[in-house]
Amino acid sequence: MSEPLPPKEGEPRPQKEESQNDTLEATESKSQHITGLKLGLVVASVTFVAFLMLLDMSIIVTAIPHITSEFHSLNDVGWYGSAYLLANCALQPLAGKLYTLLGLKYTFFAFLCIFELGSVLCGAARSSTMLIVGRAVAGMGGSGLVNGALTILSTAAPKHKQPVLIGVMMGLSQIAIVCGPLLGGAFTQHATWRWCFYINLPIGAVAAFLLLVITIPDRISSTDSELSTDKPMANIKSTLRKLDLVGFVVFAAFATMISLALEWGGSTYTWRSSVIIGLFCGGGFALIAFVLWERHVGDAVAMIPGSVAGKRQVWCSCLFMGFFSGSLLVFSYYLPIYFQAVKDVSPTLSGVYMLPGILGQVIMAMVSGFAIGKTGYYLPWALGSAVLVAIGAGLVSTFQPHTSTVKWVMYQFIAGFGRGCGMQTPIIAIQSTLSPEQGALGISLAVFGQTFGGSLFLDFANLVFGSGLRTGLSKYAPTVDTQAVTAAGATGFRDVVSKNNLPGVVKAYSLAVDHTFYLAVGATACTFVFAFGMGWRKIATKNDTRAVPETDA
């Protein structure tokens, strides 16, 4: 059957197409995109902030032993990470709601200030309790930074430039995952662990200055609102009502209970303990209550409207982000263990050894972003990303104590190449699906999926690694004290193991790391499945400012 011919000149267009074009043209006409040097400064500032966020999450890892020694707080170790995570996850949807109601630039600035305040509290902490409070405050501020940065890019840049700019931001900021432990170790060894937090202040100040001197356009609401973008607090009562604070409290309860269950399960409490079971059950009930409440208040007020979360492209993108983040963090946390424990290199050199994956990721993030902006299609890159990362993770899972340099360089590069292909595709899918005023909500959900999914897979990887290490020690070094080896850590076990038992312990460590990458392969396989749900959609390109409707065929 032939396609219908386009209308001749002078004939009216079909009503549906006309309304779509009018909406897009109206949005474009109201948007005041920035270009040139100003756009470059905006990209630099939000990249600084995203880098800062990932640096803060990774830099504390090498400082924790010294912190626990100073505060005599070994029992509080779990809270140094979970306090940040709990606050960050619980506030993600609320942060997205704030970006839809209040001015984009100053809301982002407020979150940055809260994050910096948390860093000051951590750096100045005189007790373990003060440090935990500071981590929670930093998590509150961090809940609005990555999603705010992505929202700023999607508002400030023309549609055809957004893929490459998002790729640049996400690709470069991921370097912080490698730099964090290196800087943390350097500060702890040569200065003080407090600089692990104070380093956030100058970087954040540079980003804040760049944003304050540049005018960033706000999103345009498609309907008349009780709130004014120019005067966001003109009606405080209406603002509070639209924030859906009841929904926030219920969602925060869900996120807190599930996060605590994952944090404590297998370490503080056994998985079968009443505490862990109670937390999972309570989190499940809170989630059900949240869904019912959101349906009750309706999309106009709901913190996570059904019209946003219910779209297949949105929830598939969020799940893609969660599994993608899980795979990425397995690489980031367990490759250094392989290099330091198995290859016996220093923390600094292990960071250098991870450069092939990082370079492949950064290069391909920019290349794929440019290609998506030119062609308008993001789904092939998401699918290609899943395939390449799965292959790379599978190859890395074959690492042995004597794996050659050529192999560990090339295998990392393949995985990094794949990560760079797909890391920005969920954000692009969400932006192409939702209206401009709903974009911040969708991005917040994706960032929540990224944070929550990454945390979940790190917990799973920790269980897999611990189990694999104990099994390997009993098989390859049955005479060693397993508890002493695990207590000594990945860099200290050589001091407590005899020369005869050392090869067996190294072999056990190598196999335990390999097992964690089976988990990365599984996570990446899930991204391949959910990528199809992100939709075959052609986004606007430089020569075509109209998005092509999705085809489900």
Swiss-Prot record:
Comp. bias (Basic and acidic residues): 1-19
Subcellular location: Membrane
UniProt superkingdom: Eukaryota
Pfam family of the protein (one): MFS_1
Annotated glycosylation sites: N21, N543
Chief localisation class: membrane
PANTHER family: MAJOR FACILITATOR SUPERFAMILY (PTHR23501), MULTIDRUG TRANSPORTER, PUTATIVE (AFU_ORTHOLOGUE AFUA_8G00940)-RELATED (PTHR23501:SF193)
Function in brief: Efflux pump; part of the gene cluster that mediates the biosynthesis of compactin, also known as mevastatin or ML-236B, and which acts as a potent competitive inhibitor of HMG-CoA reductase.
Official protein name in the record: Efflux pump mlcE
Organism: Penicillium citrinum
Organism lineage: Eukaryota, Fungi, Dikarya, Ascomycota, Pezizomycotina
